[in-house]
């Protein structure tokens, strides 16, 4: 019997950036989680080339998270996970324990002052490489805005501890922006564009959806837009980042502020080609490819703002 049992094939959405421990990749509509190396040779080849590290954007610098992520992505790091979370003083002290900080008590106190943004990064010799990036680029350009793991021995444990915390969210007078799987390579730029458009990030987390959940979330578009099936395919093609945002001028205080309409305008028309004509400075005009891979999903109707943020930051977090 000479019929082939296994055959190599190329999956466009599966790239080297997506292959690391804990990643979820989609192959022929099936979501597969990478839980172990296939053999010792693969483990040896990937152990340094796909090393992971943790970066925490400090509470006072959350508005700079997009710039930090963009700097990391430009330097060759892949973003594995993102979460905005609040740490207690004890949580923060545990996180930085054994780090080389000259003022661990002060750093712990700073990390406990409000929500921070944790970013799990993957790259070549990631721990040392990101420390160099912080020293040579981030601190000179943005100030002392991040804390990062400084030991490969405990980077994974610190990442697991941070991402075990519940995601921060306000769940009131906010809107939802999803950086789609096809735009994750530009995650930092997209997040920065949203913040520059007058929004403050009040929650953020990475997600992967199976087809049932994606259909449920996008059901309002079923029978309304011809691209519905393709929209579901896009949302289930890999990890994405959901952002809860409020108007910057609120200072996180809430209030009836038209945040849904304002975010929809900042994102621009669903078709990037139209967006580039009508709203050339919009997020979709800058980062979208087509009506499906248009960089971001945003809440369309004011009455859905609370529903969509609850779906990701309460229901899926339960």
Per-region residue spans from a language model:
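Non-catalytic terminal and connector segments of soluble metabolic enzymes
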Residues: 24, 44-318
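Extended amphipathic alpha-helical elements
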Residues: 1-47
């Amino acid at each position: 019997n000479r019929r082939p049992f296994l055959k190599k094939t190329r999956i466009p959405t599966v790239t080297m950036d997506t292959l690391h421990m804990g990643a979820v990749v989609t192959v022929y509509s099936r979501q597969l989680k990478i839980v172990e190396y296939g053999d010792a040779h693969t483990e040896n080849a990937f152990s340094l080339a796909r090393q992971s590290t943790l970066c925490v954007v400090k509470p006072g610098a959350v508005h700079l998270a997009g710039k930090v992520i963009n700097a990391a992505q430009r330097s060759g790091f892949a973003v594995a996970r993102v979460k905005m979370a609040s740490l207690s003083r004890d949580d923060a002290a545990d996180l930085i324990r054994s780090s080389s900080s000259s003022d661990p008590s002060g750093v712990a106190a700073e990390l406990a002052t409000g929500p921070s943004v944790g970013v799990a990064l993957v790259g070549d010799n990631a721990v040392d490489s990101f420390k160099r990036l912080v020293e040579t680029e981030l601190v000179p350009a943005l100030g002392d805005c991040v804390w990062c793991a400084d030991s490969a021995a405990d980077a994974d444990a610190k990442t697991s501890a941070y991402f075990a915390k519940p995601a921060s969210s306000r769940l009131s007078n906010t809107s939802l922006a999803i950086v789609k799987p096809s735009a994750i390579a530009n995650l930092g730029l997209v997040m920065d564009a949203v913040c520059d458009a007058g929004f403050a990030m009040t929650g953020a987390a990475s997600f992967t959806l199976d087809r049932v959940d994606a259909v449920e979330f996008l059901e309002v578009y079923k029978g309304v837009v011809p691209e519905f099936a393709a929209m579901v395919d896009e949302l289930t093609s890999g990890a994405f980042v959901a952002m809860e945002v409020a108007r910057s001028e609120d200072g996180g205080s809430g209030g009836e502020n038209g945040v849904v309409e304002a975010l929809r305008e900042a994102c621009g028309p669903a078709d990037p080609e139209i967006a580039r004509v009508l709203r050339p400075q919009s997020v979709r005009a800058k980062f979208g490819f087509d009506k499906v891979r248009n960089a971001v999903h945003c809440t369309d109707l004011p009455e859905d703002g609370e529903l969509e943020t609850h779906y990701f930051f309460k229901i899926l977090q339960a």
